[in-house]
Amino acid sequence: MMMRWAEISVDAEPQAGDAVSEALRRAGCDGVYMRDTLQPPQVTGYLPADDRLEARLDGLQVALQTLPSFGIVGAGTALTLRTVEEADWANAWKAYYKPMRVGRHLVVTPPWETPTLYTNDIPIIVDPGMAFGTGSHPTTQLCLAALEDYMEPALRVADIGTGSGILAIAASKLGAGEVVATDNDPLAVKIASENAAVNTVPLQAQEAFPVGSYDLVVANILADVIISMAEDLAALVKPDGVLIASGIIDTRETDVRFAVESEGFAPLETRHSGEWVALVFRRSTV
């Protein structure tokens, strides 16, 4: 007998998509994905329609209601539900994930697709089912393109807030000599390690904040987190090294820029995608 599933959808503006996805995942949802072509955009996931469903939905609503206290706006709290058969959902959500080209040669693809690759293309395989970062979010794409431009052979790289590990995997495939990926969520560390194995790249994934100095550091996290850890990020980057900072909504660009530049960084460039921003800095040699 096939299992029945509850399809749960929550309205989420782009800036809240990752947080809502994480809330669904923590509630136990499988197959979490964002439908950003809808108006308003929605995040959808699937829970078993069993005797634990009501308690899980209650917990999910509580989690969604607390998001504004963390500075996350644009997340709905109302849940839209419908019941689906296992055969329907198991493949339906996968239709939203196709190979995507980012930058000049990076191709992000789910494991069930076989993308067309051209000379010098670099495939990055990421399973979107865990909702830890699939490459579809503008900030991830900004960081991937920046990595492609600033990576040089054998650089030592740190990825702060790695999520799925997509940026760390890209750095490794672009020629980094050593990559350390950190996340304070142990499940993210596990998923990043699994994704690295699928991509057959070495990756040191850990919960602990890295120590030592790095040629390039990428931090695709919230603006407030970048601001709060600006001093720690500065300690990681070697003199003349590069910091790529994103996860920044355009209204917070000035705040992030001030915090980072106050720690001895000079701006190199600013990249935009809609309302999202990636900032690239070089650490002073003085």
Label the model's feature ranges.
Residues 227-242:
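A short glycine-rich, Lys/Arg-flanked "PGG" loop and its adjoining helix->strand segment in the class I
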